[in-house]
Curated annotation (Swiss-Prot):
One of the record's GO cellular component terms: cytosol
S-S bonds: none
Name listed for the protein in its UniProt record: Catalase-peroxidase
Annotated active site: H109
Stretches for region Disordered: 1-37
Source organism per UniProt: Streptomyces ambofaciens
CDD domains: catalase_peroxidase_1, catalase_peroxidase_2
Length: 738
């Protein structure tokens, strides 16, 4: 516990015996956290399915950020930001008289938490303002950068989100220092609470690294080497100043952010063209991070007792390195100094490992004393760009071709800062580049006259008469649409990339079965498209699921019309980055009762994680699982969770039979992943289930939802709720409908 909590809080929590109240057996008040999670730390956290609720948004349901952003005079905003950058404040003086390098670091660290494996992190919601990111060691003193920007945020209010402002400021900083950026897109709407659904690692101590196993194998989905770092330790692995070993960490962590070797070199060299690091004194002079700091600090942290605590006495990383002789101007100086000098190891004033140019002139300016000069210095991770056999030729080519380097950095910076925004159609503002890039998962424009209601009815009939079963149609539509990730707005049914590699070969999609279904659907498409109108395979896949759900509802005794909106298009192989899409392959899909190999978490947690990526609520997750089970959507037609005698009929049987008091459940596997339900009276085996099934009876909150759908009066409600949740998933990537 922090030693700097306010006295009034400390008094309220501390027992007469003194010390930490938790250590002395006292549970925290609900306002302090804890609660049920303290008693049962491994219980499912369903709150991640109710994040950013409307009641927490002070702007109200009617606020349209895209419209508000569109009202901005963006050049005027940029002029105001530029004025901040060049107006040094006594309370936090600007290095070299310019806040540009600080703001580049702020923007980079806002975006740099993105990881491609689950799409989480990134700049899209301005999470750098909240814990834990606001207090990560690697984000030291970025609280000051954001505070410097408050006058700009205050002036433009809700028309400019913090999330957009952080990235825009990074761009303005680059432009003010002579660099031509690739472009900027707004559209990052703020949220109002810290993310609780991101796994940042197993460690409970800053800068610990329990995330490795075997031959330095980094745990998935993590994208940094230590808790509280954005990427790598700049001193080298665990502080070991070995540039070759550091290069391995760089390649791993930047790769997990979807950056290749050229982009990695460009980003590191481009970013380190500007500014300096800060390590004027020992780390024990630095106080608590912003989240732990006392109330009078008003959200600022890392108060420094060394000297003046700022300017030339600042302490952030503990390293004291300035890379170039022009730290506030774009140049090729980083590569010049990297290749033209030899470096020897030294320790910073804080005791950190860094490198200084041997026998070099003092050509680097001091950040705050114009009478001083210094020799060029480098980080261990900078030297990786010279000594790693893959990075070195890239670095040398960039050194010899400055224009190529500038273009590579501009593009890599744009990718870094826009990677989690979703398709280009969501980009806002006058500075959005015309060029569409492969990492944006581009889709073609719709071709031909769209289908109408009569066409849809005709196609439904053809689909249901095609010989494909309800199970096949539902499973294919689900497989296509459920790739969507709300974290970075990738995936989904639009584009029909399920017919392309790598998706058509994913184990969870049962490639042989999928190929059979796609052949039938493509035949229907070709026949229809021989006329004057066109239907995309993407639309046809979803329509097949739609027709199947309607048929299944009718079998259950309910006539429903499942909403369907045409307009999807088919992506091309040329515009599909297969390697990038490999990250979307599910390691588990509890909705299909699929559990891949090597998962660390039990199936019920993975189901919850999948539901979270699909932006589902707990009721939506519940009703979808119950419906998909009776519709036969299980992986390889597994009997697990198929608690019905009428498969293909959209009944609430899953819930009725799961909650049947006449059934007792026993594990059938040593790892307790599968179970059988026996008739309590006869001992006859009635059902088989997985953890992703039985959790709806064992977890008290999910059981409460299951009871709703198992009730005698819930049959029709179940059908309508399933349809609503189904349509939501089918349309998750239909940003054109919002």
């Amino acid at each position: 516990m922090s030693e700097n909590h306010d006295a009034i809080v400390t008094d309220a929590k501390t027992e007469e015996a003194g010390g930490c109240p938790v250590a002395h057996g006292r549970a925290p008040h609900p306002t302090q956290g804890g609660g049920n999670r303290q008693w049962w730390p491994e219980r499912l956290n369903l709150k991640i399915l109710a994040k950013n609720p409307a009641v927490a948004n002070p702007l109200g349901d009617g606020f349209d950020y895209a419209e508000a952003f569109g009202s901005l005079d963006l050049p005027a905003v940029k002029r105001d930001i530029a004025e901040v950058l060049t107006t040094s404040q006594d309370w936090w003086p600007a290095d070299f008289g310019h806040y540009g390098p600080l703001m580049i670091r702020m923007a980079w660290h806002s975006a740099g938490t993105y990881r491609i494996s689950d799409g989480r992190g990134g700049a899209g919601a301005g999470q750098q303002r909240f814990a834990p990111l606001n207090s990560w060691p690697d984000n030291g003193n970025l609280d000051k950068a954001r505070r410097l920007l408050w006058p700009v945020k205050k002036k433009y209010g809700q028309s400019l989100s913090w999330a957009d402002l952080l990235i825009l400021t990074g761009n303005v900083a680059l432009e003010q220092m002579g660099f031509e950026t690739f472009g900027f897109a707004g559209g990052r709407a703020d949220v109002w609470e810290a993310e609780e659904d991101v796994y940042w690692g197993p460690e409970t101590t800053w800068l610990d690294d329990r995330r490795y196993s075997g031959d330095r194998e980094l745990e998935n989905p993590l994208g940094a080497v230590q808790m509280g770092l954005i990427y790598v330790n700049p001193e080298g692995p665990n502080g070991n100043p070995d540039p070759i070993a550091a290069a391995r960490d760089i390649r791993e962590t930047f790769g997990r952010m979807a950056m290749n070797d050229e982009e990695t070199v460009a980003l590191i060299a481009g970013g380190h063209t500007f500014g300096k690091t800060h390590g004027a004194g020992p780390a024990d002079h630095v106080g608590d991070d912003p989240e732990a700091a006392s109330m009078e600090e008003q959200g600022l942290g890392w108060r420094n007792s060394f000297g003046t605590g700022k300017g030339g006495d600042a302490i952030t990383s503990g390293l004291e390195v300035t890379w170039t002789s022009t730290p506030t101007r774009w140049s090729n100086g980083f590569f010049k100094n990297l290749f033209e000098f030899e470096y020897e190891l030294e320790q910073s004033p804080a005791g950190a490992n860094q490198w200084v140019a041997k026998d070099a002139p003092e050509i680097v300016p001091d950040a705050h004393d114009p009478s001083k000069k210094h020799r060029p210095k480098m980080l261990t991770t900078d030297l990786s760009l010279r000594y790693d056999p893959i990075y070195e030729p890239i670095s040398r080519r960039f050194y010899e071709n400055p224009e190529e380097f500038a273009d590579a950095f501009a593009r890599a910076w744009y990718k870094l800062t826009h990677r989690d925004m979703g398709p280009k159609s969501l980009y806002l503002g006058p500075e959005v580049p015309e060029e569409t890039l492969l990492w944006q998962d581009p889709l073609p424009e719709a071709d031909g006259e769209p289908v109408d209601a009569e066409d849809v009815a005709t196609l439904k009939t053809k689909l249901l008469e095609s010989g494909l079963s309800v199970s096949q149609l539902v499973s294919t539509a689900w497989a296509s649409a459920s790739t969507f990730r709300g974290s970075d707005k990738r995936g989904g049914a639009n584009g029909a990339r399920i017919r392309l590699e790598p998706q058509r070969g994913w184990e969870v999609n049962e490639p042989d079965e999928l190929a059979q279904v796609l052949r039938v659907l493509e035949g229907i498409q070709q026949e229809f498209n021989s006329g004057t109108k066109k239907v995309s395979l993407a639309d046809l896949i979803v329509l097949g699921g739609t027709a199947a759900v309607e048929k299944a509802a009718k079998e259950a005794g309910f006539q429903v019309q499942v909403p369907f909106t045409a307009g999807r298009v088919d992506a091309t192989e040329e515009h599909t980055d297969a390697e990038s899409f490999e990250a979307l392959e599910p390691v588990a899909d509890g909705f299909r009762n699929y559990l891949g190999k090597g998962n660390r978490l039990p199936a019920e947690y993975l189901l919850l994680d999948r539901a979270n990526l699909l932006t589902l609520s707990a009721p939506e997750m519940t009703v979808l699982v119950g419906g998909l089970r009776v519709l036969g959507a299980n992986y390889q037609k597994s009997p697990l969770g198929a608690f019905t005698r009428t498969p293909g009929s959209l009944t609430n049987d899953f819930f009725v039979n799961l909650l049947d008091l006449g059934v007792t459940w026993k594990s059938t596997s040593e790892d307790q992943t599968t179970f059988e339900g026996r008739d309590a009276a006869t001992g006859e085996v009635k059902w088989a289930g997985s953890r992703a099934d039985l959790v709806f009876g064992s977890n008290s909150e999910l059981r409460a939802l299951a009871e709703v759908y198992a009730s005698d009066d819930a049959k029709e409600k179940f059908v309508h709720d399933f349809v609503d949740a189904w349509v939501k998933v089918m349309n998750l990537d239909r940003f054109d409908l919002v």
